[in-house]
């Protein structure tokens, strides 16, 4: 089955270790972006994964494409356009000092892209599953219009659409609230992925959940999922990640899935000494897409997604460099971290 993900991939510039920005005169350069991260996860699991974006014609973009190809992601559908490559700067947190992200995405190639710039007949050729996030619609008004066009074109072709709502308050700067856009985009989504804040800010659907407290009441998430599915009858299910933030490097991690009939809750992992949590949600999304297409029951699909994401917290960089067997071992209870010989 061919899976296409669509969004922006950026140059990631990170302060070394747990240093503050420019504490030393260097930044570690890699690449990353929500939808690209999902494509890499799926390729690592042996799925036929393609990534679609708009990139400039320069050497940095070429290096980015080569990096994706290294992981087995098909990049043939990437469109070249005007503009620049987006950048994000990352400062890794520790203990009570949170991680910090600074975006530099204005006038990037995908921010300048508009409806009509992508040949959707070509893009969706052979595709059975399409994945997008709420990040691309936040970048610019034209990128928002292109995102809406993408899901509309996908549904015309009866392609399954998954969307990670991914609310990013610092990106919505062109005059529209996230909910104005995402409530429309959600009408074309089959599988929704979110955390509690995403649902509240992107869909304006709430229950009495304190998103800042770090404490979880799972019954309220059942109600929250029900409200989303009642509001969007097109959705087949919604998965909600459950993160308890004790500190920047100690999180509790679990998820639930609601398909309107049954409510599934995963095992909870206590993740201590987090190495890099950026991309953790994307690794969950990639794991869920894999799980829903490779397991007969939704509980196993959910457990795979949560275990995959748990492992990502110990992997440096945006991409989740783990295999199906790595995830399966953790699902099976092998989480000791002992040397495997």
Where are these regions (language model features)?
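Hydrophobic beta-strand scaffold residues
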Residues: 49, 75, 161-162, 193
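Short beta-strand/loop segments at the ligand-binding rim of alpha/beta enzyme cores
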Residues: 158-165, 171
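Conserved post-catalytic alpha-helical subdomain immediately downstream of the catalytic base
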Residues: 264-334
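Conserved N-terminal subdomain of the carbohydrate kinase-like
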Residues: 48-135, 327-341
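Conserved phosphate/ATP/ADP-binding segment of small-molecule kinases
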Residues: 171-261
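A short helix->loop->beta-strand "cap" motif at the edges of active sites that frequently abuts
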Residues: 153-160, 232-236
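Glycine-rich phosphate/adenosyl-contacting loop at the front of the ribokinase-like
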Residues: 1-73, 94-96, 113-115, 273-275, ...
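Acidic-glycine-rich active-site phosphate/pyrophosphate-binding loop
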Residues: 4-19, 251-267
């Amino acid at each position: 089955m061919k899976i296409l993900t669509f969004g922006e991939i950026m140059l990631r510039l990170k302060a070394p270790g747990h240093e503050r920005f420019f504490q030393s005169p260097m930044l570690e350069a890699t690449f990353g972006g929500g939808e690209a991260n999902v494509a890499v996860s799926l390729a690592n699991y042996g799925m036929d994964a393609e990534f679609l974006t708009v990139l400039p014609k320069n050497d940095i973009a070429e290096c980015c494409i080569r990096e994706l190809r290294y992981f087995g992601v098909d990049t043939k559908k990437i469109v070249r356009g005007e503009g620049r490559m987006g950048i994000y700067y990352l400062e890794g947190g520790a203990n009570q000092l949170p991680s910090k992200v600074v975006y530099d995405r204005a006038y990037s190639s995908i921010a300048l892209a508009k409806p009509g710039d992508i040949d959707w007949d070509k893009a969706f050729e052979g595709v059975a599953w399409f994945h997008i996030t709420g990040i691309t619609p936040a970048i610019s008004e034209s990128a928002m219009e292109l995102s809406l066009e993408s899901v509309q074109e996908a549904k015309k072709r009866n392609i399954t659409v998954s969307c990670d709502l991914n609310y990013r308050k610092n990106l919505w700067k062109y005059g529209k609230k996230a909910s104005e856009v995402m409530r429309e985009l959600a009408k074309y989504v089959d599988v929704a992925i979110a955390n509690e804040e995403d649902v509240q800010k992107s869909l304006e659907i709430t229950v009495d959940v304190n998103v800042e407290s770090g404490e979880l009441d799972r019954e309220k998430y059942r109600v929250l999922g029900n409200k989303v599915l009642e509001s969007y009858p097109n959705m087949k299910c919604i998965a909600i990640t459950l993160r308890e933030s004790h500190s920047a490097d100690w999180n509790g991690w679990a998820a639930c899935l609601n398909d309107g009939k049954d409510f599934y809750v995963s095992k909870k992992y206590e993740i201590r000494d987090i190495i890099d949590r950026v991309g953790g949600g994307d690794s969950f999304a990639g794991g869920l897409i894999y799980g829903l297409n490779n397991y007969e029951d939704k509980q196993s699909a959910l457990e795979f997604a949560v275990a995959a994401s748990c492992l990502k917290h110990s992997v440096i960089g945006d991409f989740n460099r783990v295999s199906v067997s790595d995830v399966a071992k953790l699902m099976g209870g092998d989480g000791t971290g002992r040397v495997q010989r």
